[in-house]
Design a protein with these regions (language model features):
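Conserved lysine of the Walker
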Residues: 42
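Conserved Switch II/interswitch segment of TRAFAC-class P-loop GTPases
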Residues: 130-148
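Hydrophobic anchor at the beta1->P-loop junction of P-loop NTPases
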Residues: 34
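Structural motif
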Residues: 31, 114, 135-137
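The conserved Walker
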Residues: 38
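Nucleotide-state-sensitive switch-loop elements of NTP-binding domains
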Residues: 6-19, 29, 49, 53-128
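Hydrophobic positions on the alpha1 helix immediately C-terminal to the Walker A/P-loop
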Residues: 45
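Conserved small/polar residues in nucleotide/adenosyl-binding loops
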Residues: 156-162
Length: 163
């Protein structure tokens, strides 16, 4: 007997991510999933994008971490709605977590919602969270082989800025 647990988890996540995508579409919110290794510059990229976009777009941020709220506090200091999402050890954010946290935002007053995913190049790339765009931040000190070593970060993402 073969039990395909991972397959079932992925199918379930796809169903929930489709619901998240529909909800955000109904509210005209663009969800941007920002991924990268710890220290690659995800928070720095998001704060730079906030500085460039805030005059034209209403922005919110979901800060994903295993624990703590350091990055969420940095974003909140910019007067941007920010909600901390701690995974308590999980290496990625799933669509269900996004679905549960959306009511913490006034979606009718947002245009763009950034999700700073967990600092990891492996797991987050495998999970659709209902995003419209995926950005992976790669840093030069990590080496030039990340795309070759972690193919999902390159074939599932539209943008690969390097810090």
């Amino acid at each position: 007997m073969e039990i395909k647990v991972l397959h079932q988890v992925m199918e379930w996540n796809e169903d929930v991510s489709a619901e998240v995508r529909r909800t955000l579409k109904d509210h005209k919110v663009c969800l941007i999933n920002v991924m990268g290794s710890p220290g690659a510059g995800k928070t720095s990229l998001i704060t730079a994008l906030i500085a460039k976009l805030r005059e034209e777009f209403a922005i919110g941020v979901i800060e994903g971490d295993i624990t703590g709220q350091i990055d969420a506090e940095k974003i909140a200091a910019l007067k941007i709605p920010a909600v901390q999402l701690n995974t308590d050890g999980a290496c990625h954010i799933e669509a269900m977590s996004i679905q549960h946290i959306l009511p913490d935002f006034d979606l009718d007053s947002l245009d763009v919602l950034f999700v700073e995913n967990i600092g990891n190049l492996v797991c987050p790339a495998e999970f659709d969270i209902g995003e419209n765009l995926r950005i992976t931040v790669l840093s030069i000190p990590e080496g030039d082989d990340k795309v070759a070593k972690y193919p999902p970060v390159s074939y599932t993402h539209l943008t690969l800025p390097t810090t």
